[in-house]
A protein has these predicted regions:
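Short linear recognition/processing motifs and adjacent strand/loop elements at protein termini
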Residues: 1-160
């Protein structure tokens, strides 16, 4: 694995521009649960790769589970000031992740050992992508977004 931190996917989806994920503590063991510290824990480590001959894009989210264990009373007491009630049990089913978009088709997700793996076929429009991450809610739910852009597009930052 990439790190000693363990996470559980809360949400995984194909959106208009790419892929979006949010994460909660892994409840498969107390040790895994305690490795996730709200406000200090970001999105999991990941690796992205492209098989140029086939156009298959692969995203590996290290130490990330698709299916939660039981959210125990001990976990609830340990996480007392962070409200995870109602978030478990949670399962992201293996298989197709959602509808195609302008940049991705045939998007699928699976569990590979300790890692969640997402594969997609890039369309001819996909040129490059950016990564955005942060925390949602009360800084207790990290997120990760991959936004794809067309080959000849430019990002322009406008500020006041």
């Amino acid at each position: 694995g990439y790190s000693e931190r363990y996470e559980q996917l809360r949400d995984a989806r194909v959106d208009t521009e790419g892929l979006s994920f949010s994460f909660i503590p892994d409840t498969n063991s107390m040790e895994a649960f305690q490795s996730f510290f709200p406000a200090c824990t970001g999105a999991p480590g990941f690796a992205a790769s492209l098989e140029e001959e086939t156009g298959i894009f692969t995203l590996r989210l290290y130490n990330t589970r698709l299916k939660s264990g039981e959210y125990t009373r001990e976990m609830a007491q340990w996480a007392s000031s962070w409200d995870y009630d109602g978030l478990y049990p949670r399962t992201i089913p293996e298989g197709p992740l959602g509808e195609d978009n302008l940049f991705l088709s045939q998007v699928e997700i699976c569990q590979d050992g300790d890692d969640a793996v997402i594969t997609a076929r890039l369309t001819d429009r996909a040129g490059w992508f950016t990564v955005d991450s942060g925390n949602l809610g009360y800084d207790n739910i990290p997120y990760l977004r991959l936004r794809f852009r067309e080959r000849d597009s430019m990002e322009v930052e406008c500020g006041i």
